[in-house]
Regions:
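Short acidic/polar active-site loop segments enriched in Thr and Asp
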Residues: 47, 109-112, 160, 184
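Beta/alpha (TIM)-barrel catalytic core signal, keyed to glycine-rich beta->alpha loops juxtaposed to Asp/Glu
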Residues: 119-324
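A short, structured active-site edge motif that brings together acidic residues
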Residues: 75-89, 113-119, 187-190
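Short, acidic/polar
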Residues: 29-42, 91-106, 145, 168-172
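N-terminal binding-site loop/beta-alpha segment at the start of enzyme catalytic domains
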Residues: 2-79, 96, 216-219, 318-324
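Acidic (Asp/Glu)-rich catalytic clusters
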Residues: 14, 62-76, 103-107, 176-179, ...
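CE4/NodB-like, metal-dependent polysaccharide N-deacetylase domain
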Residues: 95-116, 152-156
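Active-site mouth loops of central-metabolism enzymes
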Residues: 20-32, 84-93, 135-139
């Protein structure tokens, strides 16, 4: 019997505003599938949707949101819509231009959260860098300038909150030193193989919510890894054992773990059954023993390396991009 959660767990932001702890990611959601997935997700109970112009599907998402609002399936106030400024629009005056384009595509008057997608910039004419000449260093275009553009978006009423993505503690501190508006959220890769414990602790200390992307792992990237000897998270006997004990799926355990440790999670799916299963993960409660077992899986195993940013000759290296 399908049981829809009466209410979704929420994360409290620095200003006491609430963000749903489980959302729907839309990266790699194909055109033609996104519309149906968004409508189905809203019917299930999802209210948090994570978008970005580089994903290439914001217009279709906008159509789905428009139709859901028109049909009375949900109100705008109930929704939490996140998008991101791409690396081509990091100059202060370009940030608001990019946001206005996103708002037109998603057919909304404002976002709930707008993020700097990456702590790296490249030429406006280059969507994905191919050579070192396509990139702009942080010395040429500091993140502090981009943050000023983000703040202008808040002052213009185009987004309620602003934040960052793929930022280290060091880069967060750099923004904080001159920020007039606080960082609300840092969105980073996080799962049992890559738990980001120190970053999470710093964010929580600073009242910055952490959103985990790739909370189920990122299998499509595993073949690109120099060492991918670890089993997929879905094949981990430890996680499977915990799932069996709770009569749950492995994905539900992974999502429940993320929520229970105080992060938001944004799994991607366009499959109706998985949409429901993922949503119901927010109702799963793991024991202290479960959480301890999952904590021991931390391997420092990052799937997303930002390889197109750290290409040969780039001003960005794996070391200075991630500050590791």
């Amino acid at each position: 019997m399908i049981r829809i959660l009466p209410s979704m767990k929420q994360l409290s932001l620095y200003n006491d505003q609430l963000m749903p702890a489980l959302g729907l990611g839309t990266w790699k959601s194909q055109k033609g599938e996104v519309y149906t997935a968004i409508r189905q997700a809203i019917a299930i109970g999802y209210r948090h949707f994570d978008c970005a112009p580089i994903y290439g599907n914001e217009k279709e998402i906008g159509t789905a949101l428009h139709d859901a609002l028109l049909a009375g399936d949900v109100t705008r106030k109930e929704l939490w819509i996140t998008s991101k400024v791409w690396n081509t629009h990091h100059r202060a005056e370009d940030v608001i231009v990019a946001l206005k384009r996103t708002l037109a595509d998603v057919q909304l008057g404002y976002l709930d959260l707008y993020l700097i997608h990456w702590p790296a910039a490249h030429l406006k004419t280059v969507k994905i860098p191919k050579t070192k000449e396509d990139l702009i260093s942080l010395q040429q275009l500091p993140l502090e300038e981009t943050w000023q553009g983000m703040e202008e978006c808040v002052l213009a009423g185009l987004t309620r909150h602003i934040g960052v993505s793929n930022f280290s503690t060091k880069k967060i501190k750099g923004i904080q030193a001159s920020a007039k508006i606080k960082i609300a959220v840092n969105q980073v890769e996080a799962h049992p193989y890559f738990q980001q414990k120190e970053l999470l602790a710093y964010c929580q200390q600073q009242h910055i919510a952490l959103t985990a992307y790739a909370p189920l792992g990122a299998y499509e990237r595993a073949s690109l890894m120099p060492n991918h000897s670890l089993p997929f998270l879905s094949d981990s006997p430890i996680i499977q054992r915990i799932a069996d004990q709770h009569d749950a799926t492995v994905a539900q355990v992974l999502l429940a773990w993320g929520i229970q440790r105080g992060t938001a999670v944004i799994p991607k799916s366009t499959n109706p059954d998985r949409l429901l299963q993922n949503y119901q993960a927010a109702d799963l409660s793991l024991s202290t023993e479960d959480m301890d077992m999952l904590a021991r899986l931390d391997s420092g195993y990052r799937y997303e390396r930002g390889s197109y940013i750290t290409l040969e000759g780039s001003p960005y290296t794996a070391k200075n991009l991630w500050d590791e």
